Amino acid sequence: MPAAADTEEEQPMLPLPGAPSSSWAQFCQRFRALFSGADPRVCVAFWLFGLINNVLYVVILSAALDLVGPSVPKGVVLLADVIPSFATKLIAPYFIHMVPYPVRIIIFVFLSAAGMLLVALSPPYTDGGTIATKLAGIVLASLSSGGGELSFVGLTHFYGPFSLAAWGSGTGAAGLVGAGAYALATTSLGLSVKATLLASSCLPAVMVVSFFMVLPRSPLQPISAAYAGYRAVEEREELAEEREFMEGDRDATFDEQERLLGASVLSDQSKKAGWQRFKRDLKRVRGLFFPFMLPLLLVYVAEYTINQGVSPTLLFPLDESPFAHFRAFYPAYNAIYQVGVFISRSSTPFFRIHDLYLPSFLQILNLVLLTLQAVFNFIPSVYIIFIIIFWEGLLGGLVYVNTFAEIGDRVPKEDREFSLGATTVSDAAGICIAGFVSMVFEVWLCDWQVTHGRDYCRRI
């Protein structure tokens, strides 16, 4: 009986009614228990990975108008910022395991810094410059962001669930920090766009410090033989046996021609093993699609269609809103959305969901509801829209971070690193689809509103 009582006391539960000091002490104790076993260095490193890897993406989108001018659709910047990342996430999981993590970090930092320098140093459109150089810089930064996400998410496999929670929180903070820092630098501090972007090009160096100086390296030692890649332990043993057989002592009667023939057979078997590994990885992806990749894809299509195609048309008369200008609505929506994303992406130590489709379908309902509002204008107050946008951010962040948490729980250990990296393609694919849809959808919604007597979208 005493043992049972001890067990019950160890189970987390809500504080019982009583003295406030006692309840607060119990709450603090259980709060600390949630983080039992967390390595502060791991959490700090992965939080910085998430922040820096995503913050340049946000800075570029925040600077879209300044980068390409008013005559070029901002969707061009979005697509240049997303399509290379999508291509990287689609292709790289099948070969990036051959590149050691330290080398990847150096490559990503170089691409990010070079991309931001190209964007910052190319002449502005007002001085006769073209946007081609700026778009090239955005593409380089996007390649780095895509490769960084699939690598860092895969890296969480070796550092446990707290690394994933820290990564998710860092990516959520990137939206707030990126948009806020750009607005602060260019408005409150009065810095030029060029100076702000030049300062941003120094941020990737933080990833070098985080990886080589903050992150404990011991969990990576077992995978120092990078050529082994994603292969299961059993397969590695089989390959070792094959190599031992093929490279073992040969009979003294073998002549040079037979040795060359043996080397040719080994090469052919190596190529065959590579092809078999590729086909096995494709089979893994098919197994990931419905439980993990599809709900993440759906939530991102709905989320970014709202952000890029619908929310620019969710406008109210100025005398019924807290704003003095119509162009203030969109930044306010974006800030509220980013707060929701940050909260939900930081939530896995406290709250987990296992049904990934439920929040995805709720996000689709958000898209339908806000589209109907843009068309029929039946919601009486902008403050209700604020609540829906905040809810949108919560749902999107929940699906993102819980998708990878579920992979960590449900996918076999030997397949986990590949599965985590391969699934990152879903968010980029969703953003790409939403980018193309939004370029048409926003125009259609605005035209509808104008023809029905609401021309607010033309006054921005």
Curated annotation (Swiss-Prot):
It comes from the Eukaryota. GO terms for biological process: L-arginine transmembrane transport; lysine transport; regulation of intracellular pH. It is a multi-pass membrane protein. It holds the Pfam family CLN3. It is found in: Vacuole membrane. InterPro entries: Battenin_disease_Cln3, Battenin_disease_Cln3_subgr, MFS_trans_sf. This is Protein btn1. Its main location: membrane. Gene3D superfamilies: MFS general substrate transporter like domains. Belongs to the battenin family. Involved in vacuolar transport and vacuole pH homeostasis. Also required for cytokinesis. Keywords: Amino-acid transport, Membrane, Transmembrane, Transmembrane helix, Transport, Vacuole. One of its GO terms (cellular component) is fungal-type vacuole. The chain crosses the membrane at residues 42-62, 76-96, 105-125, 135-155, 164-184, 195-215, 287-307, 323-343, 356-376, 378-398, 428-448. The keyword Repeat does not apply.
